[in-house]
């Protein structure tokens, strides 16, 4: 079974990928890091600063896989070609992002609203681009039943791997992932399938693996931010120690400070990580408000020092 990390905007950037690989990476865990989506520029002029996220030199260790967010198939095919020039083999297409700012533009899971347009997009991509192309998708916009027609469309193309997040667009991340719908449609998938959604513990991951042994992979998202050692434990490694977590978080903080040029900007990014990670510390409720209110680097550092006096759960 392959284990992957999900693309999450504002969380799984190159700084995180480097720190995670250094502190918690294990052979095959993860096998791939999927990078947060990029949108191809309409003028077809790449911005060096934005592309730095995908500089192969900045992504050592486990392979990083770029993800595209686009609704113009010809433009997406051009961008895939540019990524191939950078040395990337697989490129992932995003039909799963449920964010309102994304779907309002007809991108991400918004592509699932009109299957005729999605078909045109896929025709253009697969006729013009070369090499492996994978897809990350939701089940539909409002109902899981929509996936029957969506899958019928996907099955017509040489998708190298289909990652299914079994929620619909309107759910965002509310409610539970629909395992029953996933199980219903899995036998009808003609391509390798990866599961994504609501995997937060090694036990849950192993139970899913036992339930669906023919999956090509399992992708973890919020669970790997809440427990950076999740995949390491899945392959028999140790849980995260307090010392490892401290080193990992300090590396993230200093990396963001250097990248953004200001500690206050790094604090904002670190809060996104702590939103999931804070639950690992017993009694952390007493410090949640202080962490939310922290703006400057010194304020953040004071709260983090206090959090690390608490035992891990």
Regions found by a protein language model. Give the residues of each.
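Flavin-dependent oxidoreductase catalytic cores
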Residues: 1-313
């Amino acid at each position: 079974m392959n284990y992957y990390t999900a693309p999450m905007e504002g969380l799984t950037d190159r700084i995180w990928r480097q720190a995670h690989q250094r502190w918690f990476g294990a052979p095959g865990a993860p096998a791939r890091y999927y990078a947060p989506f990029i949108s191809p520029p309409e003028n077809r002029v790449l911005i060096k600063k934005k592309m730095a996220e995908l500089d192969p030199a900045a992504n050592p260790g486990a392979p990083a896989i770029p993800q595209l967010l686009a609704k113009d198939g010809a433009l997406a095919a051009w961008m895939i070609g540019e990524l191939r020039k950078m040395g990337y083999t697989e490129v992932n297409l995003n039909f799963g992002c449920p964010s309102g700012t994304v779907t309002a533009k007809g991108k991400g899971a918004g592509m699932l609203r009109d299957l005729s347009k999605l078909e045109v997009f896929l025709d253009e991509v697969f006729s013009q681009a070369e090499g492996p192309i994978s897809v990350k998708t939701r089940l539909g916009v409002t109902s899981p039943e929509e996936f029957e027609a969506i899958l019928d469309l996907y099955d017509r193309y040489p998708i190298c791997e289909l990652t299914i997040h079994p929620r619909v667009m309107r759910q965002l991340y509310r409610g539970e992932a629909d395992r029953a719908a996933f199980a219903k449609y899995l036998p009808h998938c003609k391509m390798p399938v990866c599961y994504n959604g609501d995997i937060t513990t090694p036990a849950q991951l192993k139970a899913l693996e036992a339930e669906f042994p023919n999956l090509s992979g399992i992708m973890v998202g919020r669970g790997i931010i809440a427990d950076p050692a999740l995949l390491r434990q899945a392959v028999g490694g140790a849980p995260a120690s307090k010392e490892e977590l401290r080193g990992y978080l300090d590396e993230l903080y200093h990396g963001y400070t250097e990248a953004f040029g200001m500690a206050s900007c790094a604090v904002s990014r670190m809060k996104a990580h702590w939103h999931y990670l804070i639950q690992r510390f017993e009694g952390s409720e007493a410090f949640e408000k202080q962490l939310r209110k922290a703006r400057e680097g010194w304020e953040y550092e004071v709260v983090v020092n206090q959090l690390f006096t608490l035992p891990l759960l």
